[in-house]
From Swiss-Prot:
Species of provenance: Mus musculus
Region (Disordered): 1-171
Disulphide bonds in the chain: none
The UniProt record lists the keyword Flavoprotein: no
Domain remarks in the Swiss-Prot or TrEMBL record: The coiled coil regions mediate binding to kinetochores.
Gene Ontology biological-process annotations: cell division; cell migration; cellular response to epidermal growth factor stimulus; chromosome segregation; mitotic sister chromatid segregation; regulation of attachment of spindle microtubules to kinetochore; spindle organization
The protein, known as: Small kinetochore-associated protein
Principal location listed in the UniProt entry: nucleus
An example Gene Ontology molecular-function term: protein homodimerization activity
Length: 312
């Protein structure tokens, strides 16, 4: 059962054109189908079926139906699409009347498919693009992209070769210029330091001469600068001891003063507290005094009233 099914899958039947008595022939084993050819064949079969339905409807109505001027046909299938089916499958439909050259040419579908795509565009300008045009477009774009990439790579190689040769020369020139500038600055600094050293040596010589003259004058007057220096050293030692003793005594006195000041501050704070208490007591006493005065005045008024009543 598997062999007839395989044969049925491999055979292809005619969908358009007048019926013939010849039986359908299977594909030769040497024929090969590319992916875009299988997709184009499927789309062409769909268009052929639509064209057959359209032709049957037109035959029953007695002629071709004229579509409205602003309406596009729902099924983009015409006799041109049926013709493309015959061109796309020449080895499976010998009744179309095509020669053997077209069958051998069907293996390389690229130019034929491009012509068919142009015809379909001309017939159906508003419809979607078929798969064949998409495949051809993608291949053309890929070829253009590859050609552009190769050209850009060649241009880059040609431009990089002289640039790489010139780069180290320019870098060396820049480095040499920098080194020359640094050398000039160093030479200037050396000359300046040499001049400063000469000035300093001259000043040192003058100071030594002045020192010798001063010592000679002191010796001529009978003064020994060495003894004077010892005496001057001993005098500050005595002064230093005296000042240290004074400082110690002052520190002791300051400590005593601080202690007494703390005690006095504590006493002052205690006195302030006592004063506050006494002020509060005086305020209370005054309040009590006023109350007593008020009560006394009330009592005097009551006594006067009682005397008046007694007199009555």
């Amino acid at each position: 059962m598997a062999a007839p099914e395989a044969e049925a899958q491999e055979t292809a039947f005619r969908t358009t054109g007048p019926p013939t008595d010849s039986e359908p022939r299977p594909f030769p084993p040497s024929s090969r189908k590319f992916p875009f050819e299988s997709a184009a064949a499927d789309s062409n079969e769909d268009w052929a079926v639509a064209a057959e339905h359209y032709l049957k409807g037109s035959g029953e109505n007695g002629g071709w139906e004229q579509p409205a001027p602003g309406v596009q046909p729902s099924h983009p299938a015409t006799m041109a699409s049926a013709k493309t089916v015959c061109d796309a499958q020449p080895h499976s439909m010998p009744s179309c009347g095509l020669p053997a050259d077209t069958q051998t040419r069907a293996t390389s579908k690229l130019p034929v498919k491009s012509k068919e795509a142009d015809l379909l565009r001309h017939l159906h300008p508003g419809g979607p693009e078929p798969d064949v045009t998409k495949v051809t477009k993608s291949r053309r774009e890929n070829g253009q992209v590859k050609a552009a990439e190769t050209a850009s790579r060649r241009n880059l190689r040609n431009s990089y070769k002289p640039f790489n040769k010139q780069k180290p020369e320019e870098e060396l020139k820049d480095k040499n210029e920098l080194l020359e500038a640094v050398n000039k600055q160093l030479h200037q600094k050396l000359t300046e330091t040499q001049g400063e050293l000469k000035d300093l040596t001259q000043k040192v010589e003058l100071l030594e001469k002045f020192q010798d003259n001063c010592l000679a004058l002191l010796e001529s007057k009978g003064l020994n600068p060495g003894q004077e220096t010892l005496a001057s050293k001993q005098e500050p030692t005595t002064d230093h001891t005296d000042s240290m003793l004074l400082l110690e005594t002052l520190k002791d006195e300051l400590k005593v003063f601080n202690e007494t000041a703390k005690k006095q501050m504590e006493e002052l704070q205690a006195l302030k507290v006592k004063l506050k208490l006494k002020e509060e007591e005086s305020v209370q006493f005054l309040e009590q005094q006023t109350l007593c005065k008020d009560e006394a005045s009330d009592f005097t008024i009551i006594l006067e009233e009682m005397e008046q009543l007694l007199e009555m």
